Amino acid sequence: MAEAEKLVRTLTGKVVSDKMDKSVVVLIERRVKHPVYGKYVSKSTKIKAHDENNECNQGDTVTIAESRPLSKTKSWTLVKIEERATRI
């Protein structure tokens, strides 16, 4: 029996902090319907991700994938940079 390819969770978000060495904080936003009132509410989550080459800058839109735990709070890795932030 062949090994089944494992599905990897990926998310897309915006880099809000790149001050750490080889790490970035990514803000993931999603819209959820309120259970009682039915209005759509924006919810967000901040996730720490591993950036091996320190190539991300604040404001970049990136894709991250779930991986094994790399530290106490970091278990996501950078897959690719979708869009670079404009530098003024």
UniProtKB/Swiss-Prot annotation:
Bridged cysteine pairs (disulfide): none
GO biological process terms held by the UniProt record: translation
Cellular component per GO, a single term: cytosolic small ribosomal subunit
Annotated keywords: Ribonucleoprotein, Ribosomal protein, RNA-binding, rRNA-binding
Molecular function GO labels: rRNA binding; structural constituent of ribosome
Signal peptide (UniProt feature, chain positions): none
UniProt xrefs under InterPro entries: NA-bd_OB-fold, Ribosomal_uS17, Ribosomal_uS17_bact/chlr, Ribosomal_uS17_CS
Pfam families xrefs: Ribosomal_S17 (PF00366)
Keyword RNA-binding attached: yes
Coiled coil: none
CDD domains: Ribosomal_uS17 (cd00364)
Quaternary context: Part of the 30S ribosomal subunit.
Protein purpose: One of the primary rRNA binding proteins, it binds specifically to the 5'-end of 16S ribosomal RNA.
Assigned protein family: Belongs to the universal ribosomal protein uS17 family.
PANTHER family according to UniProt: 40S RIBOSOMAL PROTEIN S11 FAMILY MEMBER, SMALL RIBOSOMAL SUBUNIT PROTEIN US17M
Protein name, per record: Small ribosomal subunit protein uS17
Gene that produces this protein: rpsQ
